[in-house]
């Protein structure tokens, strides 16, 4: 894009007396830096747990581009998530590895709760947004005195148990992520009804249908923030007020 200069063109002043007055300032206007969204041809390289978009499947590639652009417009919020990721991923990553869960699942609590331990209107709570019944099923205490869904280490262990069980059902990490969002029974019904087991080609509700795309977008931006016009995590740590140490003990 050409650079724009705003200024007044001087007129010929031959044999005319010079006029006194304020000097005209030359104002240089440059366009704001553009955030780089990969072209459609490169979308297939993006992946979740090594599962990529179907090659040449333009519908999925366009959806991926749209979700990436949405994250770019949420710059301040995403910068805060960068800060939280820098602090809490070191707690989550070794637990995922111990259970044989792909590291990309660390982005689930980032998308689910923004790595906050709050309670949703539906009753889901904690970093991994467990419902009370599911939390108890996978070993978490949830009662009037204690809620281990808000403990990052314990809730991550519970999430790994659940995710591993889901993989035994679906044999696909993208389907596992979708089932984590909407429930395994719903996903099984959709797979049987549509006779389709490729997440990217399935017709799902808007939240679940965009869920894995959000995970991939968050992964892309956190791993390479400069490419998408964001600051590096260390430079935005001031946005994040650390949680109590009891959340990880």
Regions found by a protein language model. Give the residues of each.
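Short, functionally critical alpha-helical segments immediately adjacent to catalytic or ligand/cofactor-binding
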Residues: 101-116, 176-181
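Low-complexity, Gly/Ser/Thr/Pro-rich intrinsically disordered linker/tail segments
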Residues: 227-249
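Solvent-exposed, polar/charged alpha-helical surfaces in well-ordered, non-transmembrane soluble domains
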Residues: 83, 90, 94, 106, ...
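Active-site metal-coordination segments of metallo-dependent hydrolases
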Residues: 81-82, 145-156, 202
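Short loop-to-helix capping motifs
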Residues: 172-173
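Substrate-binding/active-site groove segments that recognize
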Residues: 123-144, 156-159, 163
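Catalytic and substrate-binding regions of cell-wall glycan-acting enzymes that process beta-1,4-linked
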Residues: 27-71, 126-129, 133, 143, ...
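An acidic, Gly/Ser/Thr/Pro-rich helix-cap/linker signature
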Residues: 1-99, 230, 234
């Amino acid at each position: 894009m050409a650079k724009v200069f705003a200024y007044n063109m001087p007129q010929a002043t031959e044999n005319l007396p010079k006029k006194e007055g304020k000097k005209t300032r030359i104002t240089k206007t440059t366009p704001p830096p553009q955030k780089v969204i990969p072209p459609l041809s490169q979308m297939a390289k993006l992946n979740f747990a090594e599962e990529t978009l179907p090659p040449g499947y333009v519908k999925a590639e366009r959806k991926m581009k749209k979700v990436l652009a949405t994250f770019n417009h949420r710059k301040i919020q995403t910068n805060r998530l960068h800060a939280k990721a820098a602090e809490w991923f070191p707690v989550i990553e070794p637990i995922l590895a111990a259970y044989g869960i792909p590291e990309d699942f660390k982005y689930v609590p980032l998308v689910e709760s923004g790595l906050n331990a709050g309670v949703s209107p539906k009753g889901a709570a904690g970093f991994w947004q467990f419902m009370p019944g599911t939390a108890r099923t996978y070993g978490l205490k949830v009662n009037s005195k204690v809620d281990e869904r808000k403990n990052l280490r314990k809730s991550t262990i519970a999430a790994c148990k659940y995710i591993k069980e889901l993989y035994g059902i679906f044999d696909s990490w993208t389907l596992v992520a979708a089932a984590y969002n909407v429930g395994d029974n719903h996903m099984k019904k959709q797979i049987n009804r549509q006779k389709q087991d490729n997440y990217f080609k399935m017709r799902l509700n808007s939240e679940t249908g965009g869920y894995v795309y959000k995970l991939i977008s968050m992964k892309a931006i956190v791993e390479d923030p400069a490419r998408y016009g964001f600051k590096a995590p260390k430079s935005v740590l001031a946005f994040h007020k650390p949680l109590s140490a009891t959340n990880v003990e």
